[in-house]
From Swiss-Prot:
It comes from the Bacteria. The keyword Cell membrane applies. InterPro entries: DUF1232. It is found in: Cell membrane. This is Uncharacterized membrane protein YkvA. Keywords: Cell membrane, Membrane, Transmembrane, Transmembrane helix. Its main location: membrane. The chain crosses the membrane at residues 53-70, 74-93. GO terms for cellular component: plasma membrane.
Length: 106
C-alpha cells in the first residue's frame, strides 16, 4: 500500500512540477540532488543512505537518457514522465534531503 501511495504522490508531484510557479522549486530540488551526490562522493556527507543515492542516480539517469516512457521530442508531453519521476523520487527521499539541507547550513 505504501508503494501505491508513493506512486500516486509522485504523479501528483510531477503534475505540480509542470506548473510554471513550481519550476523554480523543482530546479532547487535538482540542484540539491546533485550537491548531495557530490558531497557524498567527496566524503563530506557520509550519512547518506545507499537507497537514497541509488534513487537519486536513477532519477538523474532517467532524465538525461534519450529513451523515456514518453519521448522528450513530443513537445508539451515529453517532460511529463520526467516530472513524474522527479516527483516520485522527491516523495520517497524528501526527509533525507531535508536533513542534508540542514547539515549544509551548519
Amino acid at each position: 500500500m505504501k508503494k501505491k501511495k508513493a506512486i500516486m504522490l509522485g504523479a501528483a508531484g510531477g503534475k505540480a512540477i509542470l506548473k510554471r510557479k513550481n519550476r523554480k522549486k523543482c530546479i532547487q530540488h535538482i540542484t540539491t540532488f546533485f550537491q548531495m551526490l557530490r558531497d557524498w562522493r567527496n566524503g563530506d556527507y557520509p550519512r547518506s543512505q545507499v537507497k537514497t543515492l541509488l534513487l537519486l542516480t536513477a532519477a538523474i539517469l532517467y532524465i538525461v537518457m534519450p529513451l523515456d516512457i514518453i519521448p522528450d521530442v513530443i513537445l508539451g508531453l515529453g517532460f511529463i514522465d520526467d516530472a513524474a519521476v522527479l516527483g516520485l523520487i522527491w516523495t520517497l527521499i524528501k526527509k533525507e534531503l531535508s536533513q542534508y539541507e540542514k547539515w549544509r547550513l551548519q
